[in-house]
Swiss-Prot record:
Top-level taxon of origin: Bacteria
The protein's name in its UniProt record: 3-isopropylmalate dehydratase large subunit
Pathway: Amino-acid biosynthesis; L-leucine biosynthesis; L-leucine from 3-methyl-2-oxobutanoate: step 2/4
Self-association state and partner proteins as the record states: Heterodimer of LeuC and LeuD.
Annotated EC: 4.2.1.33
GO biological process annotation, one example: L-leucine biosynthetic process
Database matches in InterPro entries: 3-IsopropMal_deHydase_lsu, Acnase/IPM_dHydase_lsu_aba_1/3, Acoase/IPM_deHydtase_lsu_aba, Aconitase_4Fe-4S_BS, Aconitase_4Fe-4S_dom, IPM_dehydratase_rel_enz, IPMI_cat
Family of this protein: Belongs to the aconitase/IPM isomerase family. LeuC type 1 subfamily.
Cofactor note text: Binds 1 [4Fe-4S] cluster per subunit.
Family annotation (HAMAP family): LeuC_type1
Names of the cofactor(s): [4Fe-4S] cluster
Keywords per UniProt: 4Fe-4S, Amino-acid biosynthesis, Branched-chain amino acid biosynthesis, Iron, Iron-sulfur, Leucine biosynthesis, Lyase, Metal-binding
Pfam families noted in UniProt: Aconitase
Biological source species: Burkholderia ambifaria (strain MC40-6)
Length: 469
Protein backbone atom coordinates (compact mmCIF):
# COMPACT_ATOMS: atom_id res chain seq x y z
CA UNK A 1 0.00 0.00 0.00
CA UNK A 2 1.35 3.43 -0.99
CA UNK A 3 2.47 5.52 1.99
CA UNK A 4 2.98 9.24 2.50
CA UNK A 5 6.22 10.57 3.93
CA UNK A 6 4.44 11.13 7.24
CA UNK A 7 3.08 7.55 7.23
CA UNK A 8 6.61 6.20 6.77
CA UNK A 9 8.05 8.32 9.56
CA UNK A 10 5.24 7.34 11.89
CA UNK A 11 5.25 3.63 11.09
CA UNK A 12 9.02 3.25 11.51
CA UNK A 13 8.85 4.64 15.06
CA UNK A 14 5.73 3.09 16.60
CA UNK A 15 6.60 0.95 19.62
CA UNK A 16 3.02 0.16 20.66
CA UNK A 17 -0.50 1.32 19.77
CA UNK A 18 -3.50 1.34 22.13
CA UNK A 19 -7.05 0.53 21.00
CA UNK A 20 -7.95 4.25 20.98
CA UNK A 21 -5.14 5.01 18.54
CA UNK A 22 -2.71 6.42 21.09
CA UNK A 23 0.78 5.28 20.13
CA UNK A 24 4.09 5.11 21.91
CA UNK A 25 6.68 6.57 19.54
CA UNK A 26 10.44 6.12 19.76
CA UNK A 27 12.25 9.47 19.68
CA UNK A 28 15.60 9.60 17.89
CA UNK A 29 16.71 13.09 18.89
CA UNK A 30 15.77 15.57 21.59
CA UNK A 31 17.01 19.15 21.43
CA UNK A 32 17.15 21.05 24.70
CA UNK A 33 17.35 24.72 25.67
CA UNK A 34 17.35 26.64 28.93
CA UNK A 35 13.69 27.69 29.14
CA UNK A 36 11.73 24.42 28.98
CA UNK A 37 14.31 22.00 30.41
CA UNK A 38 14.93 22.97 34.09
CA UNK A 39 11.74 21.40 35.46
CA UNK A 40 12.30 18.30 33.32
CA UNK A 41 15.76 17.73 34.78
CA UNK A 42 14.42 18.48 38.25
CA UNK A 43 11.82 15.74 37.73
CA UNK A 44 14.58 13.27 36.92
CA UNK A 45 16.53 14.28 40.01
CA UNK A 46 13.52 13.97 42.32
CA UNK A 47 12.71 10.50 40.95
CA UNK A 48 16.39 9.46 40.87
CA UNK A 49 16.08 8.56 37.19
CA UNK A 50 18.96 8.64 34.70
CA UNK A 51 18.76 9.95 31.16
CA UNK A 52 17.85 6.89 29.09
CA UNK A 53 20.01 7.63 26.04
CA UNK A 54 22.45 10.45 26.65
CA UNK A 55 23.77 10.61 23.07
CA UNK A 56 20.28 11.26 21.68
CA UNK A 57 20.23 14.71 23.30
CA UNK A 58 21.84 17.98 22.26
CA UNK A 59 21.53 21.20 24.26
CA UNK A 60 22.15 24.90 23.72
CA UNK A 61 21.23 28.17 25.43
CA UNK A 62 19.46 30.49 23.01
CA UNK A 63 16.41 32.26 24.47
CA UNK A 64 18.05 34.14 27.35
CA UNK A 65 21.56 34.80 26.08
CA UNK A 66 22.50 38.44 25.43
CA UNK A 67 23.12 39.44 21.82
CA UNK A 68 25.37 42.33 22.83
CA UNK A 69 28.81 42.09 24.47
CA UNK A 70 28.97 38.85 26.47
CA UNK A 71 32.20 39.57 28.32
CA UNK A 72 30.25 40.73 31.37
CA UNK A 73 27.95 37.71 31.38
CA UNK A 74 24.16 37.85 31.70
CA UNK A 75 22.78 40.87 33.55
CA UNK A 76 19.24 39.66 34.22
CA UNK A 77 19.29 37.29 37.24
CA UNK A 78 16.41 35.09 36.02
CA UNK A 79 17.96 34.68 32.57
CA UNK A 80 21.33 33.91 34.15
CA UNK A 81 19.76 31.31 36.43
CA UNK A 82 18.14 29.49 33.52
CA UNK A 83 21.36 29.43 31.49
CA UNK A 84 23.47 28.36 34.47
CA UNK A 85 20.93 25.65 35.31
CA UNK A 86 21.14 24.18 31.81
CA UNK A 87 24.94 24.21 32.04
CA UNK A 88 24.83 22.39 35.37
CA UNK A 89 22.25 19.84 34.25
CA UNK A 90 24.12 18.99 31.05
CA UNK A 91 27.38 18.65 32.97
CA UNK A 92 25.71 16.41 35.56
CA UNK A 93 24.03 14.10 33.04
CA UNK A 94 26.83 14.14 30.43
CA UNK A 95 24.73 15.72 27.67
CA UNK A 96 26.52 17.45 24.80
CA UNK A 97 25.93 21.18 25.04
CA UNK A 98 27.12 24.28 23.21
CA UNK A 99 27.54 26.84 25.98
CA UNK A 100 27.12 30.58 25.59
CA UNK A 101 30.68 31.38 24.51
CA UNK A 102 31.10 28.33 22.26
CA UNK A 103 31.30 29.34 18.58
CA UNK A 104 28.80 26.55 17.86
CA UNK A 105 26.19 28.17 20.12
CA UNK A 106 23.08 29.52 18.46
CA UNK A 107 19.34 29.11 18.09
CA UNK A 108 18.42 25.49 18.71
CA UNK A 109 16.61 25.08 15.38
CA UNK A 110 19.63 26.41 13.52
CA UNK A 111 22.42 24.55 15.29
CA UNK A 112 20.70 21.15 15.00
CA UNK A 113 20.76 21.05 11.20
CA UNK A 114 24.06 22.95 11.07
CA UNK A 115 25.76 20.23 13.11
CA UNK A 116 24.08 17.35 11.27
CA UNK A 117 22.19 16.35 14.42
CA UNK A 118 19.00 16.63 12.35
CA UNK A 119 18.84 13.70 9.94
CA UNK A 120 16.28 12.24 7.51
CA UNK A 121 13.99 9.56 8.89
CA UNK A 122 14.33 10.78 12.46
CA UNK A 123 11.73 11.66 15.04
CA UNK A 124 12.87 14.91 16.65
CA UNK A 125 11.37 16.80 19.57
CA UNK A 126 12.17 19.94 21.53
CA UNK A 127 10.39 22.01 24.13
CA UNK A 128 9.76 24.72 21.56
CA UNK A 129 6.91 25.37 19.11
CA UNK A 130 9.09 25.76 16.04
CA UNK A 131 10.67 22.32 16.16
CA UNK A 132 8.77 21.70 12.92
CA UNK A 133 11.78 23.39 11.26
CA UNK A 134 13.65 20.08 11.24
CA UNK A 135 10.99 18.45 9.08
CA UNK A 136 12.74 20.06 6.12
CA UNK A 137 15.10 17.07 6.24
CA UNK A 138 12.40 14.44 5.82
CA UNK A 139 12.04 14.06 9.59
CA UNK A 140 9.02 14.02 11.90
CA UNK A 141 9.70 16.98 14.18
CA UNK A 142 7.44 18.87 16.55
CA UNK A 143 7.40 20.79 19.80
CA UNK A 144 6.54 19.26 23.17
CA UNK A 145 5.80 20.47 26.71
CA UNK A 146 8.13 20.36 29.69
CA UNK A 147 6.56 17.21 31.19
CA UNK A 148 7.09 15.52 27.82
CA UNK A 149 10.71 16.72 27.76
CA UNK A 150 11.18 14.84 31.03
CA UNK A 151 9.41 11.76 29.64
CA UNK A 152 11.70 11.66 26.60
CA UNK A 153 14.80 12.14 28.76
CA UNK A 154 13.71 9.23 30.95
CA UNK A 155 12.32 6.81 28.34
CA UNK A 156 13.28 8.02 24.84
CA UNK A 157 9.60 7.65 23.92
CA UNK A 158 6.50 9.82 23.64
CA UNK A 159 2.75 9.18 23.64
CA UNK A 160 1.08 10.58 20.52
CA UNK A 161 -1.98 10.25 18.32
CA UNK A 162 -1.44 10.18 14.61
CA UNK A 163 -2.34 13.29 12.63
CA UNK A 164 -4.05 13.35 9.26
CA UNK A 165 -2.06 13.87 6.06
CA UNK A 166 -2.04 17.17 4.20
CA UNK A 167 -0.11 17.99 1.04
CA UNK A 168 0.63 21.61 0.21
CA UNK A 169 1.82 21.61 -3.38
CA UNK A 170 3.52 24.69 -4.83
CA UNK A 171 4.33 24.56 -8.53
CA UNK A 172 6.22 26.86 -10.86
CA UNK A 173 9.11 29.29 -10.75
CA UNK A 174 9.16 31.73 -7.85
CA UNK A 175 9.07 35.33 -9.16
CA UNK A 176 12.03 37.65 -8.66
CA UNK A 177 12.06 39.21 -5.22
CA UNK A 178 10.08 36.37 -3.64
CA UNK A 179 11.50 33.94 -1.11
CA UNK A 180 10.64 30.92 1.01
CA UNK A 181 9.24 33.32 3.63
CA UNK A 182 6.81 34.70 1.07
CA UNK A 183 5.77 31.16 0.12
CA UNK A 184 4.89 30.16 3.66
CA UNK A 185 3.17 33.45 4.48
CA UNK A 186 1.10 33.05 1.30
CA UNK A 187 0.20 29.50 2.35
CA UNK A 188 -0.91 30.65 5.81
CA UNK A 189 -2.84 33.52 4.26
CA UNK A 190 -4.61 30.97 2.08
CA UNK A 191 -5.49 28.25 4.61
CA UNK A 192 -5.45 30.29 7.83
CA UNK A 193 -3.82 29.62 11.18
CA UNK A 194 -6.28 26.77 11.80
CA UNK A 195 -6.04 25.30 8.30
CA UNK A 196 -3.50 22.70 9.33
CA UNK A 197 -5.05 21.78 12.68
CA UNK A 198 -5.04 18.01 13.09
CA UNK A 199 -2.66 17.53 10.16
CA UNK A 200 0.98 16.91 9.42
CA UNK A 201 1.81 18.96 6.33
CA UNK A 202 4.09 17.76 3.57
CA UNK A 203 5.32 20.61 1.40
CA UNK A 204 5.89 19.50 -2.18
CA UNK A 205 5.89 20.56 -5.80
CA UNK A 206 8.57 21.96 -8.09
CA UNK A 207 8.81 25.26 -6.20
CA UNK A 208 9.60 23.54 -2.91
CA UNK A 209 12.08 21.18 -4.59
CA UNK A 210 13.89 24.19 -6.05
CA UNK A 211 14.44 25.71 -2.59
CA UNK A 212 17.72 25.36 -0.73
CA UNK A 213 17.69 23.59 2.62
CA UNK A 214 17.67 27.01 4.27
CA UNK A 215 14.52 27.88 2.35
CA UNK A 216 12.87 24.58 3.19
CA UNK A 217 13.63 25.13 6.86
CA UNK A 218 11.93 28.53 6.70
CA UNK A 219 8.79 26.95 5.23
CA UNK A 220 8.67 24.07 7.72
CA UNK A 221 9.43 26.44 10.60
CA UNK A 222 6.08 28.16 10.11
CA UNK A 223 3.99 25.01 9.63
CA UNK A 224 2.99 25.41 13.27
CA UNK A 225 1.64 28.89 12.42
CA UNK A 226 -0.75 27.18 10.00
CA UNK A 227 -1.98 25.04 12.91
CA UNK A 228 -0.15 21.87 11.86
CA UNK A 229 1.56 19.50 14.26
CA UNK A 230 4.51 19.14 11.90
CA UNK A 231 5.76 20.20 8.49
CA UNK A 232 8.08 18.20 6.27
CA UNK A 233 9.78 17.97 2.88
CA UNK A 234 10.82 14.76 1.12
CA UNK A 235 14.48 13.79 0.97
CA UNK A 236 16.33 14.47 -2.28
CA UNK A 237 19.84 15.34 -3.51
CA UNK A 238 19.58 18.81 -1.98
CA UNK A 239 19.06 17.21 1.44
CA UNK A 240 21.96 14.79 1.04
CA UNK A 241 24.36 17.44 -0.28
CA UNK A 242 23.61 19.72 2.67
CA UNK A 243 24.33 17.00 5.22
CA UNK A 244 27.56 15.58 3.84
CA UNK A 245 30.55 16.24 6.06
CA UNK A 246 28.69 17.75 9.01
CA UNK A 247 29.94 16.80 12.51
CA UNK A 248 27.11 14.49 13.65
CA UNK A 249 26.63 12.79 10.26
CA UNK A 250 27.84 9.21 9.61
CA UNK A 251 31.04 8.75 7.61
CA UNK A 252 32.58 6.14 5.32
CA UNK A 253 30.53 3.01 4.69
CA UNK A 254 27.97 4.13 7.27
CA UNK A 255 27.37 7.28 5.21
CA UNK A 256 26.59 5.20 2.12
CA UNK A 257 24.20 3.00 4.09
CA UNK A 258 22.54 6.03 5.64
CA UNK A 259 22.02 7.76 2.29
CA UNK A 260 20.40 4.63 0.86
CA UNK A 261 18.04 4.52 3.85
CA UNK A 262 17.31 8.26 3.83
CA UNK A 263 16.22 8.23 0.20
CA UNK A 264 13.22 6.09 1.18
CA UNK A 265 11.70 9.05 2.99
CA UNK A 266 9.45 10.45 0.33
CA UNK A 267 5.78 9.87 -0.41
CA UNK A 268 5.07 6.90 -2.66
CA UNK A 269 3.41 7.48 -5.99
CA UNK A 270 -0.33 7.15 -5.47
CA UNK A 271 -0.18 7.86 -1.73
CA UNK A 272 -3.44 9.34 -0.49
CA UNK A 273 -3.67 12.61 1.42
CA UNK A 274 -6.64 13.70 3.51
CA UNK A 275 -6.36 17.22 2.13
CA UNK A 276 -4.46 18.76 -0.79
CA UNK A 277 -3.83 22.48 -1.21
CA UNK A 278 -2.27 23.81 -4.40
CA UNK A 279 -0.56 27.15 -5.02
CA UNK A 280 0.84 28.66 -8.20
CA UNK A 281 4.24 30.17 -7.41
CA UNK A 282 3.88 32.69 -10.24
CA UNK A 283 1.06 34.35 -8.29
CA UNK A 284 3.12 34.84 -5.11
CA UNK A 285 4.41 38.35 -4.43
CA UNK A 286 6.42 39.69 -1.47
CA UNK A 287 4.25 39.36 1.64
CA UNK A 288 3.71 41.63 4.66
CA UNK A 289 1.50 40.90 7.64
CA UNK A 290 -0.82 43.72 8.69
CA UNK A 291 -2.49 42.30 11.81
CA UNK A 292 -1.84 40.26 14.94
CA UNK A 293 -1.85 36.77 13.44
CA UNK A 294 0.29 35.31 10.63
CA UNK A 295 -2.88 34.72 8.60
CA UNK A 296 -3.47 38.48 8.54
CA UNK A 297 -1.17 38.94 5.58
CA UNK A 298 -1.28 40.61 2.20
CA UNK A 299 1.00 41.49 -0.70
CA UNK A 300 3.34 44.48 -0.62
CA UNK A 301 1.42 46.04 -3.50
CA UNK A 302 -1.85 45.63 -1.60
CA UNK A 303 -3.68 47.61 1.06
CA UNK A 304 -4.74 47.05 4.64
CA UNK A 305 -8.07 45.21 4.33
CA UNK A 306 -11.38 46.75 5.35
CA UNK A 307 -13.25 44.75 8.02
CA UNK A 308 -16.53 46.08 6.64
CA UNK A 309 -16.05 43.82 3.62
CA UNK A 310 -15.77 40.70 5.80
CA UNK A 311 -19.09 38.85 6.00
CA UNK A 312 -18.13 36.57 8.90
CA UNK A 313 -18.84 38.54 12.11
CA UNK A 314 -16.20 36.66 14.10
CA UNK A 315 -13.49 37.39 11.54
CA UNK A 316 -14.70 40.98 11.20
CA UNK A 317 -14.35 41.50 14.94
CA UNK A 318 -10.85 39.98 14.93
CA UNK A 319 -9.83 42.27 12.07
CA UNK A 320 -11.17 45.35 13.87
CA UNK A 321 -9.32 44.46 17.06
CA UNK A 322 -6.12 43.78 15.13
CA UNK A 323 -6.27 47.10 13.28
CA UNK A 324 -6.90 48.95 16.54
CA UNK A 325 -3.85 47.30 18.13
CA UNK A 326 -1.70 47.89 15.05
CA UNK A 327 -2.93 51.52 14.74
CA UNK A 328 -3.72 51.04 11.05
CA UNK A 329 -6.60 52.34 8.97
CA UNK A 330 -8.41 50.20 6.38
CA UNK A 331 -7.26 50.69 2.77
CA UNK A 332 -3.85 52.06 3.79
CA UNK A 333 -1.28 51.12 1.10
CA UNK A 334 1.21 48.67 2.63
CA UNK A 335 4.10 50.62 1.11
CA UNK A 336 3.13 53.73 3.06
CA UNK A 337 3.52 52.09 6.48
CA UNK A 338 6.56 53.49 8.30
CA UNK A 339 8.64 51.41 10.69
CA UNK A 340 10.59 52.23 13.86
CA UNK A 341 12.73 49.13 14.26
CA UNK A 342 14.06 46.30 12.11
CA UNK A 343 14.80 42.78 13.32
CA UNK A 344 16.63 40.39 10.99
CA UNK A 345 17.04 37.11 12.84
CA UNK A 346 15.13 34.22 14.51
CA UNK A 347 14.90 30.48 13.82
CA UNK A 348 12.88 31.39 10.72
CA UNK A 349 15.38 33.64 8.95
CA UNK A 350 18.84 33.87 10.55
CA UNK A 351 20.82 31.45 8.39
CA UNK A 352 23.66 32.49 6.09
CA UNK A 353 21.35 32.59 3.06
CA UNK A 354 19.07 35.02 4.91
CA UNK A 355 21.97 37.24 5.99
CA UNK A 356 23.26 37.32 2.42
CA UNK A 357 19.84 38.26 1.03
CA UNK A 358 19.50 41.17 3.45
CA UNK A 359 23.07 42.34 2.84
CA UNK A 360 22.50 42.27 -0.92
CA UNK A 361 19.61 44.72 -0.58
CA UNK A 362 21.55 47.01 1.77
CA UNK A 363 24.52 47.05 -0.59
CA UNK A 364 22.32 47.68 -3.62
CA UNK A 365 20.53 50.63 -2.02
CA UNK A 366 23.91 51.96 -0.84
CA UNK A 367 22.53 54.25 1.86
CA UNK A 368 22.32 54.33 5.64
CA UNK A 369 19.17 53.39 7.50
CA UNK A 370 16.38 55.96 7.36
CA UNK A 371 16.29 58.74 9.96
CA UNK A 372 12.98 57.49 11.38
CA UNK A 373 14.40 54.01 12.04
CA UNK A 374 15.51 53.96 15.69
CA UNK A 375 17.20 50.57 15.58
CA UNK A 376 18.03 48.04 12.88
CA UNK A 377 19.60 44.86 14.18
CA UNK A 378 20.95 41.73 12.53
CA UNK A 379 21.19 38.70 14.82
CA UNK A 380 22.88 35.68 13.18
CA UNK A 381 21.39 32.31 14.02
CA UNK A 382 24.61 30.79 15.32
CA UNK A 383 28.23 31.57 16.00
CA UNK A 384 29.15 29.67 12.84
CA UNK A 385 26.70 31.69 10.74
CA UNK A 386 28.16 34.86 12.27
CA UNK A 387 31.71 33.78 11.50
CA UNK A 388 30.82 32.86 7.90
CA UNK A 389 29.09 36.20 7.36
CA UNK A 390 32.11 38.03 8.74
CA UNK A 391 34.45 36.11 6.43
CA UNK A 392 32.28 37.33 3.55
CA UNK A 393 32.35 40.90 4.85
CA UNK A 394 28.59 41.02 5.37
CA UNK A 395 28.90 42.43 8.87
CA UNK A 396 30.64 45.51 7.45
CA UNK A 397 27.88 45.96 4.86
CA UNK A 398 25.40 46.21 7.72
CA UNK A 399 27.43 48.30 10.16
CA UNK A 400 28.45 50.79 7.46
CA UNK A 401 24.72 51.31 6.81
CA UNK A 402 23.92 51.87 10.49
CA UNK A 403 22.70 48.40 11.45
CA UNK A 404 23.80 46.73 14.69
CA UNK A 405 25.62 43.41 14.20
CA UNK A 406 24.84 41.17 17.17
CA UNK A 407 25.75 37.87 18.81
CA UNK A 408 23.53 34.81 18.10
CA UNK A 409 20.34 34.13 20.01
CA UNK A 410 16.55 34.28 19.87
CA UNK A 411 16.62 37.99 20.67
CA UNK A 412 13.73 40.23 19.60
CA UNK A 413 11.67 37.34 18.21
CA UNK A 414 10.17 37.05 21.69
CA UNK A 415 11.42 40.21 23.42
CA UNK A 416 14.29 38.65 25.37
CA UNK A 417 16.77 40.73 27.34
CA UNK A 418 16.82 44.34 26.12
CA UNK A 419 15.98 43.24 22.57
CA UNK A 420 12.37 44.39 22.50
CA UNK A 421 9.94 46.94 21.17
CA UNK A 422 8.69 49.78 23.31
CA UNK A 423 4.92 50.38 23.41
CA UNK A 424 3.66 51.72 20.10
CA UNK A 425 6.82 50.92 18.15
CA UNK A 426 6.41 49.26 14.76
CA UNK A 427 8.85 46.59 13.60
CA UNK A 428 9.64 44.90 10.29
CA UNK A 429 10.63 41.45 11.54
CA UNK A 430 11.86 38.27 9.88
CA UNK A 431 10.51 36.16 12.75
CA UNK A 432 7.43 33.92 12.76
CA UNK A 433 4.85 35.42 15.12
CA UNK A 434 3.15 38.82 15.12
CA UNK A 435 0.95 38.30 18.17
CA UNK A 436 0.09 41.20 20.46
CA UNK A 437 3.09 41.92 22.68
CA UNK A 438 5.22 39.19 21.11
CA UNK A 439 8.19 41.55 20.61
CA UNK A 440 7.43 43.70 23.63
CA UNK A 441 4.32 45.01 25.39
CA UNK A 442 2.42 47.24 22.99
CA UNK A 443 4.84 46.51 20.14
CA UNK A 444 3.52 46.13 16.59
CA UNK A 445 5.07 43.41 14.45
CA UNK A 446 4.99 43.00 10.67
CA UNK A 447 6.39 39.70 9.38
CA UNK A 448 8.48 39.90 6.20
CA UNK A 449 11.43 38.27 4.44
CA UNK A 450 15.03 39.35 5.18
CA UNK A 451 15.23 41.27 1.91
CA UNK A 452 12.00 43.11 2.67
CA UNK A 453 13.18 43.95 6.20
CA UNK A 454 16.49 45.28 4.90
CA UNK A 455 14.76 47.47 2.33
CA UNK A 456 12.37 48.84 4.96
CA UNK A 457 15.34 49.77 7.14
CA UNK A 458 16.91 51.87 4.38
CA UNK A 459 13.69 53.45 3.11
CA UNK A 460 12.00 53.87 6.49
CA UNK A 461 8.83 52.17 5.28
CA UNK A 462 7.82 49.01 3.48
CA UNK A 463 8.78 48.90 -0.18
CA UNK A 464 8.30 46.46 -3.05
CA UNK A 465 11.73 44.92 -3.47
CA UNK A 466 10.76 43.76 -6.95
CA UNK A 467 11.27 47.38 -8.00
CA UNK A 468 14.90 47.38 -6.87
CA UNK A 469 16.03 45.46 -9.95
Amino acid sequence: MAQTLYDKLWNTHVVHTEDDGTALLYIDRQLLHEVTSPQAFEGLNVAHRPVWRISANLAVSDHNVPTTDRSHGIADPVSKLQVDTLDANCDAFGITQFKMNDVRQGIVHIIGPEQGATLPGMTIVCGDSHTSTHGAFGALAHGIGTSEVEHVLATQTLLQKKSKNMLVKVEGALPRGCTAKDIVLAIIGRIGTAGGTGYAIEFGGSTIRALTMEGRMTVCNMAIEAGARAGMVAVDDTTIDYLKGRPFVPTGAEWDQAVEYWREFKSDEGAQFDRVVELNAAEIVPQVTWGTSPEMVTSIDGRVPDPEREKDPVKRDAMERALAYMALEPNTPMESIKVDKIFIGSCTNARIEDIRAAAYVVKKLNRRIASNVRLAMVVPGSGLVKAQAEREGLDKVFTDAGFEWREPGCSMCLAMNADRLDPGERCASTSNRNFEGRQGAGGRTHLVSPAMAAAAAIEGHFVDIRQLG
